[in-house]
Design a protein with these regions (language model features):
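Metal-dependent enolase-superfamily TIM-barrel catalytic cores that perform enediolate-based chemistry
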Residues: 1-76
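Catalytic cores of large soluble enzymes that bind and process phosphate-bearing ligands
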Residues: 4-11, 112, 137, 189
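Structural signal for hydrophobic packing residues in well-ordered secondary-structure cores
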Residues: 20-23, 53, 149-153, 202-205
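Shared catalytic-loop signature of beta/alpha-barrel
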Residues: 47, 53-56, 64-187
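Extended hydrophobic packing segments that form well-structured cores
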Residues: 189-219
Length: 219
């Protein structure tokens, strides 16, 4: 866990203020911290964000210490979301039992598939906890997440990152209209892979700045 300088924190809050002013009060607004902050700074930010009526503050703390999440949640009116880095329903069980957050974010790939995602959602339903599936791994994961979400009574929304250059791995792209995906109706996941383009996506190691200390990458 890391912290920003006071100046960086003030800039962050001002950025959120300007976005809220631009979109108005009726648009859902979320802030994602990628687990960067220590507890004191996460608490300060969550409390300062209260005036902006966020839908949630995503992963303000690293995922390992659930008691820290309990302390954070008790200290703020800003809803908290987390769970994208968990890989099993047993981790989500503890997360839910401790009431660490307001929304959980299981990923169909990281948790072992759409059936496991569905089981996690069923468990969350008993805690009246909405599910916001994490989804940053391309159109195949999106298709799996759509099917799982279709049978989740407590599904809220699906994370979706449009990356046009990755859509060509499908013969027919998924249909997105007015912010909603149409459920594919073909067998299986309802998609067909375009194997001709696989050579364009050979794995290449790379570094992501998602978990780099905030001081090193901020602005």
């Amino acid at each position: 866990a890391h912290s920003m300088t006071k100046k960086q924190e003030n800039i962050t809050v001002e950025c959120v203020r300007q976005v809220r002013d631009a979109v108005g009060p009726d648009i859902n607004l979320m802030v994602d911290a990628h687990g960067r902050f220590d507890l004191p700074q996460a608490r300060r930010l969550a409390q300062r964000f209260e005036e902006f009526d966020l839908l949630f503050f995503e992963e303000p703390l690293p995922p390992e210490n659930l008691d820290a999440y309990v302390e954070l949640k008790r200290s703020t009116k800003t809803p908290i979301a987390t769970g994208e880095r968990y890989v099993a329903r047993f981790q989500f069980r503890e997360l839910l039992e401790k009431y660490c957050c307001d929304y959980i974010q299981p990923d169909a790939i990281y948790t072992g598939g759409m059936n496991e995602l569905r089981k996690i959602a069923m468990m969350a339903e008993t805690y009246y906890c909405p599910v916001v599936p994490h989804n940053c791994n391309g159109p195949v994961c999106t298709a799996a997440s759509i099917h799982a979400a279709a049978c989740m009574p407590n599904f809220l929304m699906l994370e979706y990152i449009p990356v046009p250059e990755r859509e060509d791995v499908l013969v027919e792209p998924l249909v997105l209209k007015n912010g909603e995906f149409e459920l594919p109706k073909k067998p299986g996941l309802g998609i067909e892979l375009n194997k001709k383009v696989f050579k364009n996506y050979i794995f290449q190691p790379r570094d992501l700045d998602h978990f780099t200390p905030a001081r090193e990458i901020f602005l």
